Amino acid sequence: MARSIKKGPFVDLHLLSKVEAAREANDKRPIKTWSRRSTVLPDFIGLTIAVHNGKQHVPVYVTENMVGHKLGEFSHTRTFKGHSGDRKAAGRK
């Protein structure tokens, strides 16, 4: 179920204050955050936000298409190693 429109998008206040400070100072350094639950706002466009994936901070350059999504969607937490191949088919070739 989607979030109520009357509540508005959720953004952690510490992240919002860091974004506003970076905008005022015209700072292009990545903003480090652990807040995967925050919604991407139009103010974030053009900034690089380093989102924590549980192990490291993954730099995410925010574009116009990302507005309305959560930051955690762009920083994957699991590594897919691939399915094991068919052992019989590999031996025949």
UniProtKB/Swiss-Prot annotation:
Residues forming coiled coils: none
Domain of life: Bacteria
PROSITE patterns, sorted: RIBOSOMAL_S19
Alphabetic keyword roster: Ribonucleoprotein, Ribosomal protein, RNA-binding, rRNA-binding
GO cellular component, as recorded: cytoplasm; small ribosomal subunit
SUPFAM superfamilies hit by this protein: Ribosomal protein S19
InterPro entries documented for this protein: Ribosomal_uS19 (IPR002222), Ribosomal_uS19_bac-type (IPR005732), Ribosomal_uS19_CS (IPR020934), Ribosomal_uS19_SF (IPR023575)
Record family assignment: Belongs to the universal ribosomal protein uS19 family.
Function: Protein S19 forms a complex with S13 that binds strongly to the 16S ribosomal RNA.
NCBIfam families according to UniProt: rpsS_bact
PANTHER family: RIBOSOMAL PROTEIN S19P FAMILY MEMBER, SMALL RIBOSOMAL SUBUNIT PROTEIN US19M
Stored HAMAP family: Ribosomal_uS19 (MF_00531)
Protein name per its UniProtKB record: Small ribosomal subunit protein uS19
Organism: Nitrosospira multiformis (strain ATCC 25196 / NCIMB 11849 / C 71)
Gene from which this protein is expressed: rpsS
